[in-house]
Amino acid sequence: MKEAEKIEELLGRGVDKIYPSRELLEETLLSGKKLKLYQGFDPTGDKLHIGHMVGLRKHRQWQDLGHEVIFLIGDGTGEAGDPTGKKKTRERFFTSEELRENAKDYLAQARKIVRFDGPNPIKIMYNGDWLNKLTKTDILNIAEHFSVQQLIERDMFQERLKKRESINLREFLYPLLQAYDSVHMEVDLELGGSDQTFNMLAGRTLLKAMKYKEKFVMTTPLLSDSKGIKIGKSEGNVIALTDEPNDLFGKIMSL
């Protein structure tokens, strides 16, 4: 397959949206420029599921095209607790130690799909390495680029307000922490599920404000079950990559 055909497949298959535009990203790739990109994974469980497969397959495509790909373990963001899609505040928040322990299983499972060694290996990083070192001044400098109105506009927060459910300040600030990942690593592109669009665009805003650098965002479609509910840990309909082959087949066929 020719390089142009590989780029066409990368941008056209298993992709929901590209920001600011597919045309600009395609032009950049056809110019021969190699990008630095990442996807973050908060290991709030110990199993990757088929919903992660779409992103991991994209990782492999970017990797095979010679780009610098980072598999980011969100042990720092995971402590804050991503509120995306959650109708209530979590009953408990994870510690950095718990998240790093879960990450071992994530990496073992991801190795079956992407390469962490050999030619152009995917890099493994932990955002706790820099988020845990942020000072008060650092956090204030990040926060000044966002408004409460911007953050509170999110669908799940609006739904909570209507139902008089609490919004924990810890999870409220989550997008700012994820946004800082892009700044610290100075990436060219962030990859993630379409439900992460708000968080990823926050990173685009912050990177432009703090480093004067533009970042592409590529979102992948979410997998849903037969009821149209997103497959995920919180929804309780996970189909884990570690399931026995027969169980895995049966669960997939029931979607």
For every predicted segment, state its role:
Residues R60, H67, F71-A110:
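Active-site rim/loop-helix segments in enzyme catalytic domains that contact anionic ligands
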Residues F93-T219:
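Divalent-metal (Mg2+/Mn2+/Ca2+)-assisted nucleotide/phosphate chemistry catalytic cores
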Residues K86-R92, N141-A143, S234-E235:
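Short, hinge-like loop/turn segments at secondary-structure boundaries
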Residues M1-P43, I229, G236, N246:
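Non-catalytic terminal extensions that flank enzyme cores
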Residues G74, M218-P221:
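Catalytic beta-strand/loop signature of glycosyltransferases that borders the donor
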Residues G32-G40, V69, Y174-H184, D243:
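Short, hydrophobic/aliphatic alpha-helical segments
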Residues S21-P83, L191-T197, G203:
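N-terminal catalytic cores of NTP/NDP-binding nucleotidyl/phosphoryl-transfer enzymes
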Residues E144-S147, P221-L255:
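Catalytic adenosine-cofactor/nucleotide-binding cores of aminoacyl-tRNA synthetases and other
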